[in-house]
C-alpha cells in the first residue's frame, strides 16, 4: 500500500515485479551481444576450417568483436596488393558468411619493418592500406553492404612480434578482418559503438 495525498493507494506487487530495472535490461542486452558474437565465430570457424587447421588463418574471440587474422603470404605476393587466387577463395568463404550479418566490418592491413619504395607503394603505409582496400573491394563484390565496410592501413606501426627474425616479421605481415558487435543500445548510435570498440581494442593492444 502506498499513500498519495494522504489517501491509501493499492499497488499490484506482480505489476511492480514485471518492470525490469534498467541495469537488468542492459545486462541482458550485453549478454545477447556476447552470444551473437559466439555464434558468428562458430560460423566463421566452420567456413574457414581448413585454413585455420593449416595455421594460415587465426580467429580470435572477444565479447564485443572478432578478429580473423590472415597471414599476408596467403593473400599477397611480397610487395604486392593484388590478391592471390588461393587467398581470394578463402576470403570469398568469409565474405559469404558476412553477407547475412548486420555487423560493421573493418579490414586492417599491417606490414613488417622492412622498407618498401616503389611507384605504387612509396612506403609501408601505402602497401598496408592498399592490401586492406583490396580485401574490402572483394567483400563488396561478393555482396557485403558497402555501408558496413571500412579499411585502414597501419604500416609497420603495430607489430605483434619482433622484427629481428624472419619468423617475427612473417607474423607482423598480416591482414585482420574485424567484425564488430552491435552496441547501439549501450552507446549513442553506430559511430559511438564503433568508437567504443576501437578504444577497447587499443587498450587490449597496449597491455
Task: Describe every region a protein language model picked out.
Residues 39, 43, 52-56, 61-65, ...:
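Extracytoplasmic
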Residues 2, 6, 45, 49, ...:
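Sec-exported extracytoplasmic/periplasmic mature domains
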Residues 1-71, 185-206:
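Juxtamembrane linker/hinge segments adjacent to a transmembrane helix in small membrane proteins
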Residues 33-36, 40, 44, 87-90, ...:
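Stable alpha-helical elements in mature extracytoplasmic
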Residues 75-90, 110-195:
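Periplasmic OmpA-like peptidoglycan-binding domain that tethers envelope proteins to the cell wall
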